[in-house]
Every structure is written in C-alpha cells, then in structure tokens.
Swiss-Prot record:
Disulfide bond sites: C54-C70, C181-C198, C210-C236
Family statement drawn from the similarity comment of this UniProt entry: Belongs to the peptidase S1 family.
InterPro entries assigned: Peptidase_S1_PA, Peptidase_S1_PA_chymotrypsin, Peptidase_S1A, Trypsin_dom, TRYPSIN_HIS, TRYPSIN_SER
The protein's name: Mite allergen Der p 3
Name of the coding gene: DERP3
Length: 261
C-alpha cells in the first residue's frame, strides 16, 4: 500500500502524495488482523527481489496479479515469487519471473489503473493446501457496500513500523462506498476513481493493509474471487481513512488480453 505522509500532504499536496514508498516497502502489512492459518489464503504469493517487497495473487499456474506500482521500474529477470508458504522468507517454492505487464494507463500521480500481471518462467504446482488459484469477478462487477472482504499480506503491523512479520496475516474488512471514500479523501486532496474500491472501519480505524502488503489480494471469500488489489491509503488503519484498492472487475478484458499473449 502506498502511504501518504501528513506533512507532505500539507506542504506539497497531491503530486508528492502519489509517490509510493519504494522497495523494499511499497506494500503495506496487515493492521488489526491475525495470523493466517494453513489453507486460508492459498492464492497469496510473495513478490521478491533480494527479499519480499510486494504481494500478489495466483490466477493460474503461470499468472500472478499484482499492483502496477509494485513493478514500476522493475526488471523481470531480477524478480521471483515464493508460493505455497505462510512465510515470505522460507518454505514453499520460488519461481523466477519471465515477463511483467503493467497497465499501459497506470497513473503514478493519481495511482489510477494500479494493476499489473506477472508471467512466470515455469508453472506453479497448484491444488495444494497453501497453493491454489482464485477466480476473477464478472466483467464490470463492483463490490457491495458493507460486504466483508479479506485482505492478506506480510506488511507492517502498524504505521511507522519497519519490521515485516515472518508469517502471513489476514484481516476481514467491510466495503465502504466510493462516494463516502471520496468525501473522506478530499480532505487529503486525493481522488478515489471508479477504478478503485475502499474498505475498512471508518468510524474506529484499526483494520487495514499497510506498508508491505501492496499488490496483494482483496478477496470475496464467499465466492472465491479476487475483487481488489492492495493499492494506496493515508497512513495505516487511521480513523476516517479506509484503505483504497484497485477494482479488479473493471480490468477483466485487460487481464484476459494479456493472459492470451
């Protein structure tokens, strides 16, 4: 998750706000969640250079869904993924990345179209307890306000932390309306577009993704579909500022066009 700094908000406004915290921490960790049990988030992978820096979601044996801000400026030959493990630093298997496909209209200023696909050099061995693909939502579909979705990752456990947890964590959050989310973020000069969804406890805070979770899955557990990608937010689990996630339903045609290459 890209994190906004309050002083930068006041002094430099949206242009600086949109700059991500660069690897090894463009993604956020899970705040207010708990350790994921074996089999709870089998679609989760760790995207790595020399170590973990972003999350991702298994779509099939060759394809990983992640955020464009995670792969911006990255070279495929220097990246790998670890899957089939609840730990980002050991266990499971590692596979090298063959190709990176970031959305052509990714806007690092507004953090819009924050979606990317990764193709692996060799196939993953799926249908294991901690290694399974997740489905995609219908084209153009949106999440319903109030519905619960699951966010997972190895991000920081609190804002300002600089230590990643060794084990995968997850949190269930409620979807917040796009209108309300836009009203909240207008105070920080940020815009929530139709390509984004929001989630969290607006009234109390305390549940969110944080640095180290970027690119990771937001899943409708009931339907086993990845409906979002961890993208950006203002701090971590702050009251009045829900997390903002890429709306996967708006990119189904784009995803399928890349997977056919």
């Amino acid at each position: 998750m890209i994190i906004y700094n309050i002083l930068i908000v006041l002094l430099l406004a949206i242009n600086t706000l949109a700059n991500p915290i660069l690897p090894a921490s463009p993604n956020a960790t899970i705040v207010g969640g708990e350790k994921a049990l074996a089999g709870e988030c089998p679609y989760q992978i760790s995207l790595q250079s020399s170590s973990h820096f972003c999350g991702g979601t298994i779509l099939d044996e060759y394809w990983i869904l992640t955020a464009a801000h995670c792969v911006a400026g990255q070279t495929a030959s220097k990246l790998s993924i670890r899957y089939n493990s609840l730990k980002h630093s050991l266990g499971g298997e590692k596979i090298s990345v063959a190709k990176i496909f970031a959305h052509e209209k990714y806007d690092s200023y507004q953090i819009d179209n924050d979606i990317a696909l990764i193709k692996l050099k060799s196939p993953m061995k799926l249908n294991q307890k901690n290694a399974k693909a997740v489905g995609l939502p219908a084209k153009g579909s949106d999440v319903k306000v109030g519905d619960q979705v699951r966010v997972s990752g190895w991000g920081y456990l609190e804002e300002g932390s600089y230590s990643l947890p060794s084990e995968l964590r997850r949190v269930d959050i409620a979807v917040v309306s796009r209108k309300e989310c836009n009203e909240l973020y207008s105070k920080a000069n940020a815009e929530v577009t139709d390509n984004m969804i929001c989630g969290g406890d607006v009234a109390n805070g305390g549940k969110d993704s944080c640095q180290g979770d970027s690119g990771g899955p937001v899943v409708d557990v009931k339907n086993n579909q990845v409906v979002g990608i961890v993208s950006w937010g203002y701090g971590c689990a702050r009251k009045g500022y829900p997390g903002v996630y890429t709306r996967v339903g708006n990119f189904i045609d784009w995803i399928e066009s890349k997977r056919s290459q």
